[in-house]
Amino acid sequence: MCSIGEDDFGDEGAAHAMVVEALPLGIVLSPGNCSKCDVNSGELYKLNFRAAECRECFLTYARHKFRAALGAAKILPRNAEVLLVLDGSAKSLVLLDMLHFAQTQNQFKRLHCNARVVYVEEQQVQDRDPVDLEALLSLSVQYAPFDFYVIELGQGCSLQRIKDYSPSLKANNELIHKLQKLQSLTARQDYLQQQRKNLICSVAQSLQCTHVFEPNISVDLATQLLTAIALGRGASAALDVALLDDRLSGDVKLLRPLKDLSEQEIQFYIHAQRLKPLFQSGSHYGMERGPTASLQNLTSAFVANLQHNYASTVSTVFRTGDKIAVNSDPEQATCVHCQSALDSELSDTLLAIEYSRSVSEAGVSLYKNGQDLESLAKKRLEMQDGLCHACRAIQAELESGNLL
């Protein structure tokens, strides 16, 4: 397969210093000639730093990004067992449509893999109405012969074929009860993300899939990179934005084949293929509480503002993550919850955080017992609890019970 060329198929290629063209962006409904094939079209698509093109040329361009991402690194073996994660968002439908198209090509152009689809039902956790089952069933018919499954977040043993699925009772969802024990929205969102990743890994193992396709695009990866650093997972931030994330248990590999697509390209693809997302973008847990409610919300709002005003900056942010070296030491200990690398040495910053926490917990007794708080802070950091700094912060917020 070919790889992405900067001039034609990068997010902005070498156009980071270019002045934005004065031509209108978006779908031009007036007829015109395609700049690629010179065919007159009644609907032209105008992307940033690209000339207006017809529907067929745009779809070819977008699908090439998907194929090139997988082909450049040659990380998907022939006839691999693939699990595609569907959450009902526009980007997950684009990934489903692109994979289905790649599977229905002739023998030479066909993407040789065996795909299954799992819909992760999160509506219970988000306290929203359940997904429209009829719309989900119609998707399974439209994208046959893919096998469709449904699993509910917080219900570990709820994997069912879509034709057999029936929603479970909200009162039995253990994840909802554990989220209620966490004090801050930052901790809830972080814990929910890690639980979701671990759930998808368990589904892949039960279906004997070696690779998982996740529908993250460039703006998602830029947000994930900054969030990981802010939460204290900087040592593993590179894997949060990489095409291949091999931290999952059971030798399951997580792939992000849409990493080079922008939000604008996703919306254009949805329009071109007349796809109907099950949910609107920005419907993640806790997003409705505003940008200042959590660290994740604030980071997402910051990146969204960058995307709106300085489109090429977002590409620069997440591509910086690709340049961060990953610690490939096989003996490096990892967090038992999020699989991030554990700190091998005591950090002055972490020591200061634990010292501050010790002072807060000691309170008025600090003047009575005169205990060495610095030694206490060091002892806490040296405890072999198997958790990274970010997961220890979640554990500290739990009113009762264990993180795992």
Swiss-Prot record:
Recorded metabolic or biological pathway in which this protein acts: tRNA modification; 5-methoxycarbonylmethyl-2-thiouridine-tRNA biosynthesis
Official protein name in the record: Cytoplasmic tRNA 2-thiolation protein 2
Protein function: Plays a central role in 2-thiolation of mcm(5)S(2)U at tRNA wobble positions of tRNA(Lys), tRNA(Glu) and tRNA(Gln). May act by forming a heterodimer with NCS6/CTU1 that ligates sulfur from thiocarboxylated URM1 onto the uridine of tRNAs at wobble position.
PANTHER family membership: CYTOPLASMIC TRNA 2-THIOLATION PROTEIN 2
GO CC annotations on file: cytosol
Keywords: Cytoplasm, tRNA processing
Family stated for the protein in its record: Belongs to the CTU2/NCS2 family.
Predominant localisation class: cytoplasm
Lineage: Eukaryota, Metazoa, Ecdysozoa, Arthropoda, Hexapoda
GO-annotated molecular function: nucleotidyltransferase activity; sulfurtransferase activity; tRNA binding
